[in-house]
Every structure is written in C-alpha cells, then in structure tokens.
Swiss-Prot record:
Family note: Belongs to the urease gamma subunit family.
Gene Ontology cellular component terms for the protein in this record: cytoplasm
The protein's name in its UniProt record: Urease subunit gamma
Gene: ureA
Entry annotated with the keyword Phosphoprotein: no
GO biological process: urea catabolic process
UniProt key word Hydrolase: yes
Subunit: Heterotrimer of UreA (gamma), UreB (beta) and UreC (alpha) subunits. Three heterotrimers associate to form the active enzyme.
The protein's Enzyme Commission number: 3.5.1.5
Amino acid sequence: MHFTQREQDKLMIVVAAEVARRRKARGLKLNHPEALALISDELLEGARDGKTVAELMSYGRQILNKEDVMDGVEHMITDIEIEATFPDGTKLITVHHPIV
C-alpha cells in the first residue's frame, strides 16, 4: 500500500488525535501537539460529514477549553489552518483562538 504525502499527513493527525482522545478521557491535560491534532481531526471529519466552513470555524472553538490543556497551550495555538475535503471540493478552514 502506498500513500501520498498528504494522505500520510492526515493519517498522522488521526493517530495523534486518537491518542489525545484517550488521554483526555483519562482526565489528562493535552499538550500542544495533542490539542492541535484533536481539533484538526474534528474539523476534517466535520468537513467530510458535510458541515460548512462557517459551521466548522465556530465548532473549532468549542472542542477544547483551557481546562483541557496544559498550562500555556492555549496561548501557543493562536490559529489553526487546515485544508479539508468537502463534498464540493477542498477548502481552507481557519479557526482563530481555538482554545478559550
């Protein structure tokens, strides 16, 4: 099986997001890469489910809060930009200040 670089990147996000979900479920605070992966994966899946860019930009700010992440992580992630596949093509989703 051969994956393109883009497919490998998306698989890495999925794996990191699953680790983050398990750690969050155990009550652990997420670090920077875990928080970024979890939010990114939720946005990618929302796009595949048919949500609009506007809906995902709003939803991206509801996934995690300051209590879910280690100290300072909310300041490290000021914006998330991810290219997602929608039913009508690929679009860029930008979420400003995703952890509030």
